[in-house]
Amino acid sequence: MLNAYKHSGKAELKPVISKIIAEIPEIRRHVREVIDIVRETINEVNQLPIEKQKEIIEKNWPELLEEKPRTEEKSLPPLPNAAKGRVVTRFAPNPDYTIHLGNARPALLSYWYAEMYEGKMILRFEDTDPRTKAPFPEAYDRIRNDLKWLGIKWNEEYIQSLRLPILYNALRELIKHGGAYVDKCSPKEFKKLRDSGKPCPHRELPPEKHLEELDRIFEGYYSEGEAVVRVKTDLSHPDPSVRDWVAARIIDTSKTPHPIVGDKYILWPTYNLAAAIDDHLMGVTHILRAKEHVSNTIKQKFLYDHMGWKYPETIHFGRLSLEGVILSKSRMRKMIVEYNMEPYDDPRFGTLSGLRRRGIVRETLWRIIKDVGINVIDARISYVNLAAINRSIIDPQAKRYMAIEEALPLKLIGFNNSIEAHVLRHPSTRETYNYIIKPGDIVYISQKDFNIIQNKMFRLMGIGNFALTRPVFSKNYIGFEARLISLSAKEAKQYRAPIIQWVKLEQSIRVKLIIPKETNLETRILLAEKALTNEELGNIVQFYRIGFARIDSKEPEEIKCIFAHE
């Protein structure tokens, strides 16, 4: 009634059905049967004058005519000290793996803020550790592709391993300013001095001496562990890790070559040196990163003070995790070896490619990350909540298909002429897939459905109302006869008849449904409508009374789908 009144007295089926499903989600499973009733009701309402429609609404539901305030999408808070056209953000992943949900947060926030202030965003690969966090050659492109899938467009791109000469020049300047020195103490000796707040004996040598030692490092005079470059900080700082932190170390790249520059370099900047210098040289104005980097911010500010630079505005936010999926890089690597898992897009992983493969769309991640924003409190998202958001986004587009498991044959009797069955592909459209059901045809239902239709009327979706009569023993199958009672959807509703999905064997396709469960993958074998073969790879569909799934691969005799959620 309200839909008709708001649209010049004429209601439309599509928005009415969508509204019903939104308010009564459980009706989704029976929408094929409800749609005829809704269509009849709409025809009755549309025959009323618009004045009569308003009168009925005012009498029965006056609150529906009240104007409600519009709720706006949650927006990001402003950045401190930000001006239009002058904001420069950066997303700086380590290409030792691909991006997961937690990484997507700084990536999207950096992009959104750059857009908000009409500034620019930099993508910078921080790959200056060829040993402990060795880059994966394929990770660079995978990260680029993941960012593109998220809808992120960056203005500039840098790879730090290709910028080592630039970083070396900055390191020389830092030494000249008295802000760094070459330390030749053993790690054990330095730790003892650091813990007691005492300086290394090399610390107060003149910058010229340290520049000479730096040249000796470049010439290969020192081996791994014999010398490091340190930044001078506060030796009484309460956090011992801040005290004269390591800025660069020697790594024997003949043993662990870098995937891009090979064994060309032996002195490698640490994260804090490379990030701090590049943030300044690239003009970064705002850094958005997790609060685990607070100590890194403290360390880097010492370097900035030595050089007389202004440190960027830094926003630290809490960690973002997702229940039921694996986000830890180290755990992923371990499982790849132990369980022979796929490296990046295994659907058990919380990587963007893993989530995408199981049917999570980017709009879902947008909404989650915009909701948590830059809050400093850790956010743990349940998969149930993620699924609810994802469902609200994919439900309006995902086509529906019947699918059964543990097939049980029914021989349909009780009618003389063929029945044209209409299986709805989506409740908001008139698109259907039509079947011709002839007397004596065999359809297959799930064994679990058979257990609930004994001794009662049931409705075969899109066909009509039936009742079981007797077992059938054939040389080809053992099943049951089902006699047609009526075609009426209203009668099915009146008697609360269970609605049963079915397939015809000659018009079906085998479906392997993969269901991620923590560290396991469960498999269900279905028989689905053969029309499913018309869907493209990557499409998300809904199997009636099973849930949403993404088409992962297609073969002539089988389609593999990854289960997303109900």
Swiss-Prot record:
It catalyses: tRNA(Glu) + L-glutamate + ATP = L-glutamyl-tRNA(Glu) + AMP + diphosphate. The keyword rRNA processing does not apply. Keywords: Aminoacyl-tRNA synthetase, ATP-binding, Cytoplasm, Ligase, Nucleotide-binding, Protein biosynthesis. PANTHER family: GLUTAMATE--TRNA LIGASE, GLUTAMINE-TRNA LIGASE. NCBIfam families: gltX_arch, PRK04156.1. Belongs to the class-I aminoacyl-tRNA synthetase family. Glutamate--tRNA ligase type 2 subfamily. This is Glutamate--tRNA ligase. It comes from Staphylothermus marinus (strain ATCC 43588 / DSM 3639 / JCM 9404 / F1). The gene is gltX.
